[in-house]
A protein has these predicted regions:
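Conserved non-catalytic scaffold segment of RNase H-like nuclease domains
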Residues: 1-113, 123-126, 135-149
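Glycine-rich phosphate-binding loop plus the immediately following alpha-helix
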Residues: 129
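Short, glycine/charged-rich beta-strand-loop motifs at protein surfaces that mediate ligand recognition
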Residues: 147-152, 173
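Acidic, divalent-metal-coordinating active-site segment for phosphoryl/phosphodiester hydrolysis
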Residues: 151-166
């Protein structure tokens, strides 16, 4: 079974107030094993990146100004995810932004039925929390020392490890070339 673990970075917290995507990162799992295939892009949001958002992910308006707009990367992104199940931490946030961007270019939305929300899984498994990505990495002994700032691709890689722990643990001896 093919699954895509993905994360986004944005200019703010709500696409309904004009905030936009600035980065998408995704990695492919097949039968719960990383295949080594990934998708990553930065996106020009056509607006300024507020200082608060830049402090989270480190992506400035200046850095993003020559990056492609979402409509230029949408087909490639949709081809990468295909009809696979999506694994996302706090899925309503990321799917909300992705669906807003897809709506701007008249593409159909991603359906929540194809999404596994690892935040919901974590809350069921660890109801006393905390259940942030950093907290889950610490709980499961996953090295997140490279994560000085949020980054969509690195966060997807960390989330894949967390997801595998949440569903029953990693099989250390099994890896794909």
């Amino acid at each position: 079974m093919r699954e895509i673990v993905l994360d986004t970075e944005t200019t703010g917290l709500d696409p309904l107030t004009g905030h936009r995507l600035v980065e998408v990162g995704a990695i492919e799992l097949f039968n719960h094993l990383p295949t080594g295939k990934s998708y990553h892009t930065f996106i020009n949001p056509d607006r300024d990146v507020p200082r608060e958002a830049e402090a989270v992910h480190g992506l400035s308006s200046e850095f993003l100004k020559d990056k492609p707009r979402f409509e230029k990367i949408a087909d490639e992104f949709l081809a990468f995810i295909g009809d696979s199940m999506l694994v996302i931490h706090n899925a309503s946030f990321d799917v909300g932004f992705l669906n807003a961007e897809l709506g701007f270019i008249k593409k159909p939305p991603l359906l929540y039925e194809r999404v596994t929300d690892t935040l919901m899984l974590a809350k069921k498994r660890h109801p006393m929390g905390p259940n942030s990505l950093d907290a889950l990495c610490k709980r499961y002994g996953i090295d997140n020392s490279k994560r000085a700032k949020h980054g969509a691709l690195l966060d997807s890689e960390l989330l894949a490890d967390v997801y595998l722990e949440l569903i029953g643990g990693r099989q250390i001896a099994l890896t794909l070339p």
